[in-house]
C-alpha cells in the first residue's frame, strides 16, 4: 500500500488529494468537539474539527465512528444553537483515503453499493441536528471533503484554499449526495462544470460561482464562521431551527434517491479500468490517461 501523503506540492495538475490510512499517527480522537466561549460563557455554539491533519483530514470509516459519536453528543446538548464544522491543520478535508479506494476495486459491485451508501450517510448524519451548520473551510476541500461542506447550511472559505469535485478525473461517479446538493446551491450550469470538469478552483472563485457565502483570508475563516454563528444564535432559537428545517426540506426530499443512485453508479465504476488508472496516476503523481487512444499526444 502507498504510505505517503499526497499534498498540494506533489499533485500534478490538480489531481485529487489523497492519503493512506497506513500512515502512523498517535492514537487520538479523529473528530474533536469544542464549546465556543465568550467571556468564559458558553454561547450555544459548538466547533467540530476533523482531526487527521497529517493526512489532510481524509474521510474514513474509522473517522466516521468518532464523527457519529460527536453528532450524538451534540444532539444531547439542550443549549445548542449552531455548529461550526472545520478541519484541524492546513486542510478542511482533502478527499478520500487511498487505501479505502484500493480496497473498493477488489470488492463486488453489490458490496460496494452497500458500503458507499453507508459511508455517505455516516458523514451526512450531522444534518440530523436541528440547528444551522456552518462549514469553515480553512484549507483544501477536495472530493468527498467538499461534498461534506456542500451538505452544510452555510460555507465560509479561505480565499486561497483549493476546492473541487475531482471524481470524474479519478474515474468514478460523484458521491455523498453532491449531485443533488450542488445543483440546489448553484444550479445546473455550475454544477455540471464542477462535476464534469473535475477542475480545482480557489476559494475566491468558489464565492464568485455561488458555492460559498464568503471568501476571506485563511486566518479569518474560523472567526468569520463563528461571527456568523453568533449573529444567528442571538435570534429566536425556535424560529431559527424551524426555518432551518424548512430550508432543508427541499434538499432532503430527493436526497435518498440521489444517495442510492450515486452509490449504485459508483459501484459500477469500481469495476472499471478507469478507476484503476486513476489510482495508479495518484500513486505516480501524474495525470490519469483516461480514453488515451482519443488523443494523439498520449498514444
Curated annotation (Swiss-Prot):
- Main localization is mitochondrion
E.C. designation(s): 4.2.1.-
What is the top EC class of this enzyme, as a single word? lyase
Q: Name one GO molecular function term.
A: lyase activity
Q: What disulfide bonds does the UniProt entry report for this chain?
A: none
Q: Name one GO biological process term.
A: fatty acid beta-oxidation
Do you know which SUPFAM superfamilies this protein is assigned to?
Answer: ClpP/crotonase (SSF52096)
Q: Is Transit peptide a UniProt keyword of this protein?
A: yes
**Transit peptide per record:** 1-14
Under what name is this protein listed?
3-hydroxybutyryl-CoA dehydratase-like protein, mitochondrial
